[in-house]
Structure formats: structure tokens, C-alpha cells
Design a protein with these regions (language model features):
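Generic anion/oxyanion-binding catalytic loop in active/binding sites
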Residues: 17, 51-52, 62-65, 104, ...
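Detector for the c-type heme attachment site
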Residues: 76-83, 120-121, 149-150
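Short, flexible, mixed-charge acidic loops at enzyme active sites
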Residues: 41, 87-95
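N-terminal export/targeting leaders of redox proteins
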Residues: 1-49
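Extracytoplasmic electron-transfer domains, predominantly the class I c-type cytochrome c fold
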Residues: 92-148
Length: 154
């Protein structure tokens, strides 16, 4: 093997090792995950939105059904809401990993209104697209927000 061939081989091997390690151990997240995803000029408005639903078995069941079905949240965030690469089927390589809804720090940092705003407008700089009114009604979005809050209790 030539010197150049060895360098190419070692570079490819190193790339595979990094890929396998990040795949095996998942995405740990970063402090940036806690920064608001709503633009600063809209944050106060988003935080003022109030969830009209009180958590109940019926509302949580509706939110779960939407999360796992019609809104296909679980395709990226996973059935357990762990985000990272746990769901990942729709997350392209190199993209920002989906939010970990089960993270206590994230649950404390994010208001229901911010989550609702993201469902309505999407999240700039991520693969999170807007879902209202194309896929979800406002009530359905709030039901999903209510369900996402349950990940913080698991």
C-alpha cells in the first residue's frame, strides 16, 4: 500500500469509528438544546399562550395517538420522546438531532406556549416543520403538547 493509500485508508477508518461511536452512544445533546427555538421577537407572545387542556387520561390518550400517528412525532423524537437518534428515521445525517422531550432541564425550560408555537410555525435551523393548520388543528396541537409533558414524568 502506498503512503497516499495508507492515509486515505486511515482517514476512512477514523471516519467509520467516529460514526459508529456516535451511533452506538447516541446524541447527548448540548446546552444549546435549552435555548428558545422561538425567534426572540416572538418569544413573549409564544410564552403567553395557555394550554386550554388540563391533563387527563382522555387528553393524554388523544395526544399519544396523534404523537405516534397523524403528526408522526415519534418518527424523529422516538416513542419514548428521547429524541437524539432514537427515532431518527426522518432525520438526515448531519442534521440537528431532534429534541429529547424526556430531559428534565428541557421540560423546565420550555413553556407549553413555546411548544405550541413550534408546532404552528416550525423551528428555524432544524428539520421541524410547521404542522398547523395543514396537519393539525389547534386542539390537536395542544393535546400533543399535553402528551409531551408526560415524558417529563417518566
Amino acid at each position: 500500500m502506498t503512503s497516499l493509500g495508507r492515509k486515505v485508508f486511515c482517514g476512512n477508518l477514523l471516519g467509520m469509528v467516529v460514526f459508529l461511536l456516535t451511533s452506538a452512544f447516541g446524541w447527548a445533546g448540548s446546552p444549546g438544546d435549552l435555548k428558545p427555538r422561538v425567534p426572540p421577537e416572538r418569544l413573549e407572545e409564544a410564552q403567553s399562550f395557555q394550554n386550554p387542556f388540563t391533563p387527563s387520561d382522555a387528553i393524554i390518550a388523544k395526544g399519544k395517538k396523534l404523537y405516534e400517528g397523524k403528526a408522526f412525532c415519534s418518527a424523529c423524537h422516538g416513542l419514548e420522546g428521547a429524541g437524539g437518534r432514537s427515532g431518527g428515521r426522518l432525520t438526515p445525517p448531519g442534521a440537528q438531532p431532534p429534541t429529547n422531550f424526556a430531559d428534565a432541564a428541557w421540560q423546565a425550560a420550555r413553556t407549553d406556549g413555546e411548544m405550541f408555537w413550534i408546532l404552528k410555525h416550525g423551528s428555524h435551523g432544524t428539520d421541524m416543520a410547521p404542522y398547523m393548520p395543514l396537519y393539525l388543528s389547534e386542539d390537536e396541537a395542544w393535546q400533543i403538547v399535553t402528551y409531551i409533558r408526560m415524558f417529563g414524568d417518566m
